[in-house]
């Protein structure tokens, strides 16, 4: 089986927090970060990377400058959407997320376990080099899985950061962790 390179990109800064809006677009800073992502990806233009995005506005808006520059379609894939929390009231989401992030993976709610498994399964089955525009917790799932970390939270990916992984023979391995910052989590 061929080796596949995957670049995980955390979306640019959201216009509002996840606890205030279930699907915000990008802030002005986030739009600048999306442009910076496009520039950081220029060396990959000729390498036939497919562009994949979470269905959330902030991820799609982060992908758009690259998509336009490359004249490449963005494939929307809900496997790379944020942690499932539709049954959690907006005003409780941040509190809920903080408790979930530090919970032992075996103790996670079933919908979160299924979400985590689906991300890993999808990555293992990607057949071509891909750039995936996604979220804080999705990147944590992947890096935590690779490092066999016992809880969901394993890093603090910065907005617009690029984390590189490879998939070979059904195994995911880490090439490079993207820039991190200690930030208020706005998934």
What are these model-predicted stretches?
Residues 55-59, 79, 134-138:
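Short, conserved alpha-helical segments within structured domains
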Residues 16-17, 84-85, 141:
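Conserved protein kinase catalytic core
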Residues 2-4, 72-76, 81-95, 125, ...:
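Acidic, low-complexity terminal tails and accessory targeting/binding regions
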Residues 12, 136, 180:
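Active-site metal-binding loops of divalent metal-dependent hydrolases
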Residues 100-127:
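Internal catalytic-core helix/loop-beta-alpha segment
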Residues 6, 49, 126-137:
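Generic beta-sheet signal
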Residues 65, 141, 145:
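Active-site signature of alpha/beta-hydrolase-fold catalytic machinery across serine-
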Residues 2-75, 99, 103, 107:
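Active-site-proximal alpha-helix that buttresses catalytic centers in soluble enzyme cores
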């Amino acid at each position: 089986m061929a080796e596949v390179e995957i670049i995980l990109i955390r979306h640019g800064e959201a216009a509002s927090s996840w606890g205030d809006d279930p699907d915000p677009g990008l802030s002005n800073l986030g739009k600048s970060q999306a442009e910076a992502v496009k520039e950081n990806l220029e060396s990959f233009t000729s390498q036939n990377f497919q562009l994949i995005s979470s269905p959330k506005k902030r991820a799609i808006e982060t992908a758009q400058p690259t998509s336009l520059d490359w004249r490449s379609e963005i494939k929307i894939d809900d496997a790379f959407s944020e942690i499932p929390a539709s049954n959690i009231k907006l005003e409780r989401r941040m509190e809920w997320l903080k408790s979930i992030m530090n919970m032992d993976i075996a103790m996670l709610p079933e919908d979160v376990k299924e979400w985590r498994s689906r991300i890993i399964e999808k990555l293992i089955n990607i057949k071509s080099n891909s750039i995936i525009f996604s979220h804080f917790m999705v990147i944590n799932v992947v890096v935590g899985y690779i490092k066999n970390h016992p809880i969901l939270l394993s890093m603090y990916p910065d907005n617009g950061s690029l984390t590189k992984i490879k998939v070979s023979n059904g195994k995911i391995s880490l090439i490079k962790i993207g820039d991190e910052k200690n930030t208020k989590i706005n998934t």
